[in-house]
Curated annotation (Swiss-Prot):
It comes from the Eukaryota. Keywords: Coiled coil, DNA damage, DNA repair, DNA-binding, Nucleus, Repeat. GO terms for biological process: base-excision repair; double-strand break repair via nonhomologous end joining; single strand break repair. This is DNA-repair protein XRCC1. Residues 58-146, 266-347 form the BRCT domain. InterPro entries: BRCT_dom, BRCT_dom_sf, BRCT_XRCC1_rpt1. It comes from Arabidopsis thaliana. Residues 1-12, 184-194 have a biased composition (Polar residues). Residues 1-57, 150-194 are annotated as: Disordered.
Length: 353
C-alpha cells in the first residue's frame, strides 16, 4: 500500500529507453567461454554493457528530450533553474512553440499558463527541477504537475510514445500485456475497462485539487457556524481543517481495509468534496467492470491528501492581512478601567523623567 502510483512511462520519471528485457538478459548455460566472449563483442548485445556508465554521464542525460520554457521567474532564480535543467541535459527555449515539451511555471492562470494549457502542453512547478537536481535522479513528476498535457520529453520512437500513452496503470505491466492479447477478440469489454480505468489514471490538475481544499474548508467552517454548539471563533478554522483531513483519512483507511467509501460517508454529517470524488471513482470502476482496484483509488487518495495538508496549512487572507495591518493579536487585547489607565499613564510619565 505504500508504493507510489505507477504512471505511463511518458508521464513517469524513468528513462523510457531502459526496459526490463535489456537489463536482465542472461546467457544460456550451455554456452562455452569462447561463445560468451564473442557474444560480449557482438553488436546485438551492446545495450547490456552500455548501462554501467559514470554517474556524471547519467546525470547529464537525465532530461534528454526535454525542451523547456520558463515563465514567471526573475533572476537570480530564473538563471539558476535554467542552469540546473541544462546541466541535466534539457534544452532551453525563450518562448513556447511547437517544439516545446515542458513549461516550468511560477504561478497558475497567467497568460503563458493558459496559452500552454490551450495548446495541450504539460506544465510543472519549479520544485521538480530542483528536486531532480538535488537528488541527481528523475523524481516522480506527478506531484509537481500543474497541468497534464502532451509528453514532457521527446521520445526517440514515435511508435513507442503512442504505445506508452495507451498503457494502463498497473502494478505488473507484464500481466497487462498478456491481458490485452487475451481480450483482443472482445473489443467492447476492453473498451469498457479502458474508459473506467482512465478515471483513476488521468490525474486531476493540482490547481483543481487545491481549489477543492479551499472550498471544503470554507464550507466546513460555514457548517460549523450553523450548528447550535459551535467552536470558539479563534478555533473554528483549525477544527474545520482537522475535520476535513480526518474524513479523508477515514476514507483512506476504509480503502486499505478493502471496504467501500460509503461506509465512511454514512458516519459524517458533512462530507468534503475530495471524499465524494473518491467515491465516484470507486463506484465508476465497479459499474464498468474495470480493472481499477481499491489500491489504485487509495493511492490517488493519499496523493490528494498531501495537497490538502499543504493547502489547509496556509493562513487565510483575512488572517494574514489583519495581523500585518494591525500588528497585534486581538485575542491579547486587555480591558482596563479608568483608574488603571490613569495609573499606567503616570508610571510611564515618571519613567520618562
Amino acid at each position: 500500500m505504500s508504493q507510489k502510483r505507477n504512471l505511463p512511462s511518458w508521464m513517469s520519471s524513468r528513462d523510457p529507453e531502459i526496459t526490463p528485457s535489456k537489463s536482465h538478459c542472461k546467457k544460456p548455460k550451455d554456452e562455452g567461454p569462447t561463445e560468451e566472449h564473442n557474444s560480449r563483442n557482438a553488436p546485438s548485445n551492446k545495450s547490456e554493457h552500455a548501462e554501467p556508465s559514470s554517474n556524471t554521464t547519467e546525470f547529464s542525460k537525465l532530461m534528454e528530450g526535454v525542451v523547456f520554457v520558463l515563465s514567471g521567474f526573475v533572476n537570480p532564480e530564473r538563471s539558476t533553474l535554467r542552469s540546473q535543467a541544462l546541466t541535466m541535459g534539457a534544452t532551453y527555449q525563450p518562448d513556447w512553440n511547437a517544439g516545446s515539451t515542458l513549461l516550468i511555471c511560477a504561478f497558475p492562470n497567467t497568460p503563458k499558463f493558459r496559452q500552454v494549457e490551450t495548446n495541450g502542453g504539460t506544465i510543472i512547478s519549479k520544485e521538480w527541477i530542483t528536486e531532480c537536481y538535488a537528488q541527481k535522479k528523475l523524481v516522480d513528476i506527478e506531484q509537481y504537475l500543474m497541468h497534464a498535457g502532451k509528453p514532457w520529453r521527446k521520445s526517440s520512437s514515435p511508435q513507442d510514445a503512442n504505445r506508452e500513452k495507451r498503457e494502463h496503470l498497473s502494478k505488473k505491466p507484464e500481466k497487462q500485456v498478456e491481458k490485452k492479447t487475451e481480450t483482443r477478440g472482445t473489443p467492447s469489454t476492453s473498451s469498457k475497462n479502458r474508459s473506467a480505468c482512465n478515471l483513476v489514471k488521468e490525474p486531476f490538475f493540482v490547481t483543481e485539487v487545491k481549489k477543492w481544499a479551499r472550498d471544503d474548508l470554507s464550507q466546513t467552517i460555514s457548517w460549523l457556524e450553523s450548528q447550535e454548539e459551535k467552536p470558539e471563533p479563534g478555533e473554528i478554522k483549525r477544527i474545520a481543517a482537522e475535520g476535513v483531513l480526518t474524513c479523508l483519512q477515514d476514507a483512506i483507511d476504509s480503502l486499505e481495509q478493502k471496504q467501500d467509501i460509503g461506509s465512511v460517508t454514512e458516519l459524517w454529517s458533512f462530507v468534503p468534496r475530495v471524499v465524494k470524488e473518491l467515491g465516484k471513482m470507486e463506484s465508476s470502476s465497479k459499474k464498468e467492470n474495470s480493472t481499477a482496484s481499491k489500491e489504485e483509488v487509495c493511492k490517488q487518495a493519499k496523493s490528494w491528501k498531501k495537497i490538502y495538508e499543504a493547502e489547509l496549512a496556509k493562513p487565510g487572507e483575512d488572517e494574514s492581512t489583519s495581523r500585518v495591518a494591525c500588528g497585534y493579536d486581538s485575542d491579547m487585547t486587555v480591558e482596563m478601567t479608568e483608574e488603571e489607565i490613569e495609573l499606567a499613564y503616570r508610571n510611564v510619565s515618571l519613567e520618562c523623567l
